[in-house]
């Protein structure tokens, strides 16, 4: 898991530079962290960053900047351990706030189905049948093109509540710039009824990180998001990928 965290897009310099446009301004930025007033904090707001790079803090930095507190989020436990061992502190408070769901991929899709509980396997098959019955044809697509990106954005904005409010013009620009970076792509369900769901992902040689998603809410009853994830899993297994990381969030 350590390698999966540190090889994620969230630890790369180009991502940390880009995520600044949707994050609160920090006073001073150093190597993989920032200083805000008298506190050391992460670079990039937690709503946009699922994993963090390794962080090493020189004790002299604490002294020179009169640091009174260190406040980090989205750290894996191995990173928490390293920081506790490295820094001399009066007290440490660890709070579990998010869960990242990670699927280790088997060698075959049949093995994946067998790994599900009987109930979940039945539910997946039922939902796929319903999708089959409501669509004449469908396939998994992947793209970095503007037309698919526009669908991803519009489906977000047509959503109710926080999901719809999330996609501001600034956030749209952020996602567009992300898509231009190497490794980022949009998976989508290409059907006779149009694009019913999308998944904004990052891929490397080992696996896939599901960063964000959208769907056409008119078709919620046939579960286009679940079908898309299932299609992605099938393709990743066929390509001998090691994992499908759903990252953190309430929709997993």
Residue spans for each PLM region:
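Conserved acetyl-CoA-binding loop-helix of GNAT-fold acetyltransferases
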Residues: 55-61, 220-234
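Cytosolic ligand/metal-binding cores
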Residues: 252
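Hydrophobic alpha-helix feature that most strongly marks membrane-spanning transmembrane helices
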Residues: 157, 213, 232-241
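A short, internal acetyl-CoA/4′-phosphopantetheine-binding micro-motif in the GNAT/acyltransferase core
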Residues: 47-57, 213-222
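Structural motif
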Residues: 51-54, 72-80
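Conserved GNAT acetyl-CoA-binding A-motif
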Residues: 67-76, 236-248
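A conserved beta-strand-loop-helix scaffold within acyl/acetyltransferase catalytic domains
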Residues: 1-41, 75-221
């Amino acid at each position: 898991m350590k390698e999966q965290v540190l090889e994620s897009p969230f630890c790369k310099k180009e991502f940390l530079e880009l995520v600044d446009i949707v994050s609160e301004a920090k006073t001073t930025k150093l190597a993989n962290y920032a200083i805000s007033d008298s506190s050391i904090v992460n670079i990039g707001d937690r709503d946009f960053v699922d994993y963090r790079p390794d962080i090493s803090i020189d004790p002299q930095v604490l002294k020179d900047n009169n640091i009174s507190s260190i406040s980090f989020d989205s750290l894996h436990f191995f990173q928490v351990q390293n920081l506790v061992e490295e820094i001399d502190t009066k007290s440490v408070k660890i709070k579990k706030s998010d869960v990242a769901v990670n699927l280790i991929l088997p060698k075959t899709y049949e093995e994946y189905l067998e790994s599900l509980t009987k109930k979940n396997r039945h539910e997946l098959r039922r939902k796929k049948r319903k999708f089959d019955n409501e669509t004449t044809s469908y396939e998994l697509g992947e793209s970095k093109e503007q037309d698919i990106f526009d669908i991803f954005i519009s489906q977000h904005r047509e959503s109710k509540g926080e999901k719809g409010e999330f996609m501001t013009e600034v956030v749209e620009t952020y996602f567009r710039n992300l898509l231009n970076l190497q490794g980022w792509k949009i998976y989508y369900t290409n059907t006779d009824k149009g694009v019913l769901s999308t998944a904004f992902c990052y891929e490397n040689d080992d696996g896939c990180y599901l960063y964000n998603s959208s769907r056409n809410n008119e078709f919620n009853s046939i579960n286009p998001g679940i079908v898309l994830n299932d299609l992605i899993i099938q393709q990743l297994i066929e390509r001998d990928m090691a994992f499908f990381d759903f990252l953190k969030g309430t929709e997993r």
